[in-house]
């Protein structure tokens, strides 16, 4: 899995959530600018923040990461 694939899945999940970046940021405890950086893959969230992000977006972390087999 390449970063561009993670980026695509993250962007799709955010779009499908119907939430604004500002609201996502508020719910996971970061700034809207930080969420924007996640979407551009400038930075990747810390594990605990990534877990919160997945909960807020109602998406499985293995989907975002492209993990198909364990």
Task: Describe the role of every protein-language-model region.
Residues 1-19:
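A short, Lys/Arg-rich alpha-helix, primarily the initiator
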Residues 24-25:
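Short alpha-helical "recognition helix" segments of helix-turn-helix
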Residues 29-44:
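Recognition helix of helix-turn-helix/homeodomain-like DNA-binding domains
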Residues 39, 65-68:
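DNA major-groove recognition helix of helix-turn-helix
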Residues 48-63:
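DNA major-groove recognition helix of helix-turn-helix/homeodomain DNA-binding modules
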């Amino acid at each position: 899995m390449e970063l561009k694939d993670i980026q695509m899945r993250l962007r799709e999940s955010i779009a499908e959530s119907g939430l604004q970046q500002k609201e996502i940021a508020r719910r996971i405890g970061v700034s809207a600018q930080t969420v924007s950086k996640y979407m551009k893959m400038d930075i990747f969230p810390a594990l605990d923040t990534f877990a919160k992000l997945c909960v807020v977006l109602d998406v499985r972390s293995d989907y975002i990461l492209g993990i198909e087999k364990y």
